[in-house]
């Protein structure tokens, strides 16, 4: 299955992290950090003179899946740049009921400056990209979740004091990220994102649940050129050993509720708890993109001193700002950012 879309050469979309060069992804994270600093410092003059670049324009949010963090962060980021966010839920528009993707995309993209699309299938993202006249930002599909990856790497570099200058020079951080759980859209982007920063990745999934082959192939290439390691296992203790970052996600994704009991049985023993963190680095950090359920991580880990989940959630705002700035304000050009 193709993960890329055929679009006009002058138009760039954010579909997945694997579509970006290492340098481009690092710039996205660096830009997110920049906007966080501006936002936190409340630099009013800087904000008014440099950031209201979309005043009088509209950013559409076409969401066919429910959302908390993605909707709030996207609307907040649009407002930061002076744009009017327009939320279009599945009950608000004709998409998929009385109107095709082609017709919807042609109409909506003619009236807005960008479309954030949160959809069920990756093919739906590609359909938007194929016919849109404005940038499409993938806000989640069943294959990828790039905004979460930008946010996660921002959270990691802040907590481990990673220098982007050193990363760009090939100086490896020697960090290890361990993922315990499902082979899903979040880890598809996060593993590539970590490897682009030279962070080694170990992924533990239950037997019978495997990473997509195209993601594995790409991960191996990115790991090799950045001096990192990439490991797949079904042994969570092995994956967690000496890990600096422990990460999990929901075991039952949206749309899989019908199979909840079967999936929970399959994931028995994959909870991140004291047994797993006991073999991790003593200064480990725990991450989760939320919402969280008890079977995924114990309360003492989730709410413990090593957890950075709420900082991670806040960083979704700055990830959205970075995406808008580069793909809308700067028309997909990663150079000459102001």
UniProtKB/Swiss-Prot annotation:
Any single GO BP term: arginine biosynthetic process via ornithine
Protein name: Ornithine carbamoyltransferase
Similarity comment: Belongs to the aspartate/ornithine carbamoyltransferase superfamily. OTCase family.
Activity regulation (UniProt): Forms a stable complex with CAR1 in the presence of ornithine and arginine. In this complex CAR1 retains activity, but ARG3 activity is inhibited.
Originating species: Saccharomyces cerevisiae (strain ATCC 204508 / S288c) (Baker's yeast)
PROSITE patterns membership: CARBAMOYLTRANSFERASE
PANTHER family: ORNITHINE CARBAMOYLTRANSFERASE, MITOCHONDRIAL (PTHR45753), ORNITHINE TRANSCARBAMYLASE, MITOCHONDRIAL (PTHR45753:SF3)
Result for mutant: residue 290 to S: Reduces activity by 86%
């Amino acid at each position: 299955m193709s993960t890329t879309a055929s679009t006009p050469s002058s138009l760039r979309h954010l579909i997945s992290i694997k579509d970006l060069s290492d340098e481009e992804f690092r710039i996205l994270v660096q830009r997110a950090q920049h906007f966080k600093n501006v936002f936190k410092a409340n630099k009013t003059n800087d904000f008014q003179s440099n950031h209201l670049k979309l005043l009088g324009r509209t950013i559409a949010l076409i969401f066919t899946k429910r959302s908390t963090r993605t909707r709030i962060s996207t609307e907040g980021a649009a407002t930061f740049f002076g744009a009017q966010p327009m939320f279009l839920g599945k009950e608000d528009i004709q998409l998929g009921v009385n109107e095709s993707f082609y017709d919807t995309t042609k109409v909506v993209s003619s009236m807005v400056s960008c479309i954030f699309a949160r959809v069920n299938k990756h093919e739906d993202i590609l359909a938007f990209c194929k016919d849109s006249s404005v940038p499409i930002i993938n806000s989640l599909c069943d294959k990828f979740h790039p905004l979460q990856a930008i946010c996660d790497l921002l959270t990691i570099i802040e907590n481990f004091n990673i220098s982007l200058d050193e990363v760009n020079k090939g100086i490896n951080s020697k960090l290890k990220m361990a993922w315990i759980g499902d082979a899903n859209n979040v880890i598809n982007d996060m593993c590539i994102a970590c490897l682009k920063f030279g962070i080694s990745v170990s992924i533990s999934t239950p037997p019978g649940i495997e990473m997509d082959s195209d993601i594995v192939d790409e991960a191996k290439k990115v790991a090799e050129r950045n001096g990192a390691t990439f490991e797949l296992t079904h042994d969570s203790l092995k994956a967690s050993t000496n890990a600096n970052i422990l990460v999990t996600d929901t075991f039952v994704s949206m749309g899989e509720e019908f199979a909840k009991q079967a999936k929970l049985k399959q994931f028995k023993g994959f909870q991140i708890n004291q047994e797993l963190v006991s073999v991790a680095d003593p200064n480990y950090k725990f991450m989760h993109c939320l919402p969280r359920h008890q079977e995924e991580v114990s309360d003492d880990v989730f709410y413990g001193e090593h957890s950075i989940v709420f900082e991670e959630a806040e960083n979704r705002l700055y990830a959205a700002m970075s995406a808008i700035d580069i793909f809308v304000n700067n028309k997909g050009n990663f150079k000459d950012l102001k």
